Amino acid sequence: MTTTESTTAASTAAPAPVPAPAPAATARALGLAHYAARGVLEYVLARHGATFAQQIALRAAINADAPQTPDDLVAQVQGSLKADPAGIRAVLDELRAKELLVADGEHLRPTEAGRELLAAVAAETAPLSARVWGGIPAEDLAAAGRVLALVTERADAELAALTA
């Protein structure tokens, strides 16, 4: 190849693509990401005969430092889901009917079946989550975490003001 051919070949090569600017973080983008990830989890939960709300309530009971009363669990789940207390009580009743939670005096405690369900869902979702979150730089995850924490704090304050 001559110098002229080399120059011609180089000048006809496509320019390197310019990366598109990162989209702005918006309420819509946050919602779409939430529902996309939640859709994956709900698909797995459905295969185990469980709902998203049941999983949240069961996880609250399992991860509690001390035995929880139904009122304790309702308050904790309401803090996460912003759901109606009556609906959360219905979820706790469903978990008792499925024998995933059991009454122990005034407290509710998770059964072995409840723990096994959560462990099975976690095992099944782990590789899916790894594919969703894998390859995202740690600094991006840290920045996203800071933004999400701030949005959560502000939205919780707005909801508290609305319902005061």
Where are these regions (language model features)?
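N-terminal leader segment of winged-helix/HTH proteins
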Residues: 1-55
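Hydrophobic alpha-helical segments
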Residues: 45, 93-96, 134, 158, ...
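Hydrophobic alpha-helical core bundles mediating ligand binding, dimerization, or RNAP-core interactions
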Residues: 26-30, 34-45, 118-121, 125-136, ...
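Membrane-interacting alpha-helical segments
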Residues: 20-23, 106-111, 164
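Generic structural concept
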Residues: 61-62, 111, 145, 152
